[in-house]
């Protein structure tokens, strides 16, 4: 409900067509991250106390990444308080939600020079590990790839239980792990 509320606020701000900076007219991703942070703070101010009274902790985070013409691709993690951090060469990715199961795979395998296809495969293996280890995480998954300087989605795949590529990766990963221990 918190993330949906923040997304609705962001959409309302775009539709209002005021001079205010929105996701649609932000000059860079830093300013876009400020827009998302502002929406989260507004949701917190409006709903946090009511949620607390129901025993629910106000906890929401977003990952915002992409490229605006004239700047390099950037990646931000935006926290529930509306503050945010930007990815660096030392921390080139972010995960939100249940990350403890799949994170070690990404930490050991990824490198900045890795082709997008390999990075996508690593992300899917990471998600498979999380799905296998936590009943609250499951399919379907959405995999979206945006290439540098293309300014559009180059690939969008909905991954469900029937996706043959995902099944093949799961099987190969499991076989490789079993082989190491035999």
Where are these regions (language model features)?
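Glycine-rich, flexible loop segments associated with nucleotide phosphate handling
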Residues: 27, 31, 56-61
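A short linear-motif detector with a strong N-terminal bias
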Residues: 39-44, 54-58, 65, 121-124
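Short beta-strand segments
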Residues: 1, 57, 61-67, 79
């Amino acid at each position: 409900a918190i993330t949906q509320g923040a997304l609705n606020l962001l959409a309302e701000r775009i539709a209002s067509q005021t001079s205010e900076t929105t996701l649609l007219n932000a000059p860079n991703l830093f300013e876009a991250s400020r827009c998302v942070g502002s929406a989260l703070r507004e949701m917190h101010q409006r709903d946090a106390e009511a949620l607390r009274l129901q025993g629910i902790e106000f906890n929401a985070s977003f990952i915002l990444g992409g490229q605006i013409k004239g700047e390099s691709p950037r990646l931000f993690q935006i926290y529930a308080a509306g503050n945010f951090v930007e990815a660096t060469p030392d921390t080139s990715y972010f995960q939100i939600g249940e990350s403890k199961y799949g994170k070690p795979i990404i930490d050991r395998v990824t490198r900045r020079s890795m082709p997008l296809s390999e990075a996508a495969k690593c992300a899917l293996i990471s998600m498979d590990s999380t799905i296998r280890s936590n009943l609250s995480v499951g399919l379907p998954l959405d995999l979206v790839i945006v290439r540098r300087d293309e300014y559009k989605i180059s690939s969008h795949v909905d991954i469900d239980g029937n996706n043959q590529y995902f099944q093949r990766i799961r099987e190969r990963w499991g076989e490789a792990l079993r082989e190491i221990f035999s």
